[in-house]
Amino acid sequence: MNFLLVSRLSQSARSVYTIAKYVEVGAELGHEVAVFGEKTSEAPCLPYSLDIRSFDYAIFVVYESWDFPDMPYLAQLLDGVPKERRVIIDCCGRYNDTIRAEHDFNHLERMDGHQGWEWVEGFEAVSTKILQPTLTPLRPGVRPFLWHGFDPRDVAREYTAAQQAAQIWAADGKSYGMVYVGHNWQRWSQVGRLLEGLEPVREQLGSICLAGCDWDKRPEWAIQQGIKGADLDPELLKRLGVEAKLPIPYDKVAEFTSRARFSPVIHRPLFNHLRMVTNRTFSTFCADTIPILMLPEDMIRAVYGPQAQALSVGDDVAGKLSDMMRRPEVYWDAVLKTRAHLAERHSFSRRFAELMAILES
């Protein structure tokens, strides 16, 4: 079966890693997967196609309005692919009533110019199959499909036992104590809490790096429009000596994150409310680091399994990090068991099987 993925790609954000994995794993399973459009410098290694008739399904991977192609390309898709063979993966919960979580919204007209009803009617005009990467969709008729996944072949360093992992981790001389890779959009409420909480153990932990857009200062566009969500505390960042780096390309994230002892898994408030997963939910476990889970406890159990509870940072950030540094074998045991769980329950081959079942239903 052949799949045409429709989305605007960015080499350091959104679903580009996941799309690359669907192309790779799809070919291994006998499926052709390509991105609709002409080749882009954002992901030049991926296959692209404008030949709509060669594909069985068009799958729209939607974060923003610009993920829908401009005319005449959108018209070609709608005319050339029957509606029952068009699918939308709603990665930001747009196909809901307007939801606010802290100062995070699924509809923000000041930024994209679209009201909530426009998103709902627009989705329904394109497809009758709307999927969201959550186990618990709010809107009737939406199907749960996690979309993102885990590929054990991408694990940066394999270990046979927690003791081996802990010994190498402790002696590795990593460049950073902690690295977070992701843009400064609706992340500061959690990043700020994490940084404030770890301050008592900052010297023991080591250097901290935030890699992505707008970690050096609040962007001018957010100031001018009065939009919350790209906030930060310059004094806190300066006091902790936090390094801000430019965005990391999707195929270098695991390698870069492996340079740190720890890496937090952080979802924006809206995603926590909707229990939505992202590519980092899974791919962080590919890096040679101890993931720190800053997610709702029920979501940790549902996605990662009970063994991952040990990696939840909880309310005592400094105490948790101190214990992780003092007893790394305990936490590497949780990491290795969680990797095994992800490989069994959330592989991309399993995602393909789930997607095929939805399409054929």
What function would you assign to each model-found segment?
Residues 54, 69-86, 100-101:
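Glycosyltransferases and closely related glycan-assembly transferases
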Residues 46-54, 323-324:
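Short amphipathic alpha-helix with an adjacent loop that forms part of the alpha/beta core around
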Residues 306-315, 323-328:
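Conserved acidic donor-binding segment of nucleotide-sugar-dependent glycosyltransferases
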Residues 103-106:
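Short secondary-structure boundary/capping segments
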Residues 325-359:
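A charged, aromatic-enriched C-terminal amphipathic alpha-helix characteristic of glycosyltransferases
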Residues 51-59, 260-261:
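Short acidic/histidine-rich motifs immediately flanking catalytic phosphotransfer sites
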Residues 2-29, 35-46, 62-74, 91-93, ...:
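Nucleotide-sugar donor-binding catalytic core of glycosyltransferases
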